[in-house]
Amino acid sequence: MKKIVLMCAAVAMLCACTKSEERTYRVTVEHPHKDCPVVVTEVPAWAESVVVKADGVELPSQLDKCLAEAAFVADVESVKEFEVIFSEKPSTTEYAPRTNAQMWWKTGDEANPYEEKDTLYSFKDDMYRKLHHHGPAIESEWGAYRVYFDKKQTIDTYGKKKGQLELRESMWYSTPEQLSAGFGHDNLRVFGSIGVGVLKGWDAEEKKMIHITDFERREARVLAKGPVRAIMEMEVEGWNYAGRKIGMTSRYTIFAGHSDVVVENFLEGDVEGLTFVTGVMKMLDTQSIKEERAVAQIGCDHPENDYTKWPKETVALAVALPEEVEILSAEDDQLSYLYQLTPNAEGVIKYHFDMNWRKSEWLSSLSDEELLTDVLAKAKAAAEPIVVERVK
């Protein structure tokens, strides 16, 4: 009995010594936000888990140690405070996943054809056909996106018919049985366009986009898979662009409850004064709205080259640029509606993009014009500032 008592006392002392830190954060928004994405920075290096509460109720959250950030989503009308507790003890709580990220290496083994990877790199432009769905992909319940691991690094879109996670089952290419069960599918052919929301180089004299062809190393990464946000990155080192050797990391983040994506481009080296472009592609039967800091288009085209199998799809795309982004011009090319941008003093260009799809059940009652104005409004709302400040 004495031995048991001593053991219990030792366990109690161990529990009492577990390191933790409780903070209070205030989140402020300009307009009401459902599933407002909140990111807490300056996470303690020793933290292994996080718990977030609002009005005493625990909210799903995640700790992304590779970024030293914690993230959660919550409904915020105007101003709301949250209790954030960091602990050195790993979490035993599993929240229902609302986001996913994945990248699959083709093994060549018929029994196990794909191996999931979080990081892949190459010194050549040879990865496009070595990866299933050609690069990393992220999804929420409302949409999915992949980035091509090639010289274009274009974003491609996957529409959802129902609000659900499904990429780990469909693997981007839904089977006839899955389509019959209400799965979504690839709904866009990007050709040589900007697609939606990727950052590319720009040749001002030729008035055309520049792909990443001359480089030293390129890497694709999955940084976070959920439950409340998923993150993928594409990094290029030693890119010979406009007579300079630079580096660029493009980070794409999708949050639970959102179809919009946050894009953060981090540029390194001698990038002052360089021009880059982003925007949305033009499509057949297109309608568009182009404003000073946001552009949207809706069009109809076949998502694949097999026209008999894949009928035309109606897709609306939008990009919105926050006030802090420096816009040099807004000159389009033949395939895309574009903005010419330059990085800020820290070498960063940040913006948001979004997609609407005619076959999404929650959008089926909208006209084409309403799909267009809705996707533009969502992208612009996503680009509004969300202020997160520690108050205790």
Model-predicted segments: where are they?
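Alpha-mannosidase-like glycoside hydrolase catalytic domains involved in N-glycan trimming
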Residues: S20-Y121, D125-D126, H133
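Extended, loop-rich substrate-binding clefts of extracytoplasmic carbohydrate-active enzymes
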Residues: S180-F255
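Solvent-exposed beta-strand/loop surfaces of large extracellular or lumenal domains
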Residues: S49-A70, N240, L284-H302, V319-S329
